[in-house]
Structures are given as structure tokens and as C-alpha cells.
């Protein structure tokens, strides 16, 4: 998949601008604060209808404006078709359209545009809260399979209902019904995550060796308080027993203490937890390796390259590692890379410079 053009209006610090993109490497540049990250954020927004910087929608609307607008034209190479995706944001909500038709639900929209994003804060992926790593797994798996997204949404709904039942001290029969349903919808989530982490172990270490060139081995585990079993009946029976053991504890704390909503993806470098013992450089390259690995998985499962979005990835890499990264990403159909300078053959790169006349300098940007 590739993006052919992007149009933004009243998005962050952009007044109005449009850019043409090409297959291969696209380098987005400009003065500091011109809005390089803002443009990548707009493109990524057309994948999940939310900012990869966790900003609320109201912060994406330019100062003194009532709405923001983004439109992208995408080409799906494997199936030979183009799609137009639009997002209109107001202070009261948002609307997503695909080929002029309003997307009724998030699940009907996610997976239309495939992107994989690396942004500077991912350096702290394995130092951050487990929720950030669960989010990364969930977004990747939702892009691969709409059934996963449906199961995830169903799980979250039942989880809210069960937590509410615990808060209101509902009787055991009501909690038991919700427990059985929670176990049922959790099974495909756990199985999909386990499969993803198994593949990540192979691909992640491969990319880490390519970029870092060391003998250190990168591996991943799934830290869970659920039951790891690929048989649904066995899983259900053991999970019921698990919940029974936690029954009094959950009643006291009035919240669900078991399930994939509390699980974690943990990285190890030479058998030491990366988040605790790894240097910032090792954490950066490990997080970048995860990004490339997940992009490769999407390509294999969907038969289509995701658009690889790399925001300010070069700034803390030495010249040798920059070259290794540029060599590595050549395998992807389209890469969007932001930065201030790039030591690469100009003929191989589509350079997009953000000019000062299309942005509000006083609001700034990245």
C-alpha cells in the first residue's frame, strides 16, 4: 500500500497544504517547528482515527478554527485499487469517509489504510506502562484481522460490565455470567497475541542484529495471569478456576484482576529485562526492530505492505547505523521519513519540504 497524496486544512499548525508522495523513500524536511511530525500524524490519523501522539482531537484543530480536514489518496497494489479516505474533526466529534461514504463504526474502518509508525517516544516502549505495549499489539492485530478488533471491542464491553457489577456488589450469579462471557471472548485475544509474540521473537532479533550488529540476543515473552492453552475447553475450565481463586480479592478491590487487559509484552536482551537494564541506544534499536517486525507481519498476513512512517528516527543514530537502517527499509514499498538532513542519493529520494507560507509559525509544530 502507498499514499499518493495528502491534503490538510487547519490541521495543527497547517493552514492549507497538499503534497504528492511516491513509492520508495519520501523524506519530509523543513525548519525546526515547521510541522514535519504534524504531517506524519495526519497521514497516520487516516489509519486509526486518532493521533499517535495521544493528543485529543480538539488539539489537532488549528488555533481559532472550528474544524480540521485531512484527505489521503491511497493505492492498494495487491488488489489494484485506489481509495480516498477523509477525516473531518470538529470540537464536537469527527467523521471518517471512505470513497465518499461515512464509516459507521471504527471496526468497519480500521484496516482500510495500513501504516506502521515509529515516533521518538517509542524509545521508551519497554520502560513505559504495560498499557502502551498492549496498545501496540492490539493495533497491529486489528490491522491484520478485523475479527480481532471485534473480539477486543466485545471484551472491553464485557469487562466494563463486570467491573460495574463488582463496584455495585452484584450477586454471584450476575458476576458469574459476565465471567463466563469474559473468558469466552478473551480466548482469541490471548491466542492471537501469543502467535504475534512468537513471530516477533524471530523477526525482532533479526532486525536488531541488522541494525546493531552485536552478539546480544533480543527476545520477547508474553507475561500473563491468564491460562496459556490452545484448547478452548481446557482454557475455559482453568480460567473459571482462576477466577474462583481471585473471587474474594476482586470483591474487596471491586475490579477484574485477571485477563488480557492486564497482560504485558516483555523484552529481554541476553536474558536481562531490556526496560530495566538496557541503555537508551539499545532500547531505541529494540523498539525500532519491533516496528519493522510488526510492519513485516502485516505485509505477510495482509499481502500488502503497510506504509512505514518513521518520525525523527535518524537524529540519535550514528552514521553507520543510519546507513544500516536505510539499507533495511528498502524492502518496504513506501517509507515516510522526517528529519532535518539525509545523507542519501537524491535521485532515490522524494524530498518534501514544508514551506513556511503554509503553516502558522507562532503555533509551532514538530
Give residue spans per PLM region.
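Conserved lysine of the Walker
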Residues: 36
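Long, charged N-terminal accessory/stalk domains
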Residues: 124-126, 131-176, 180-183
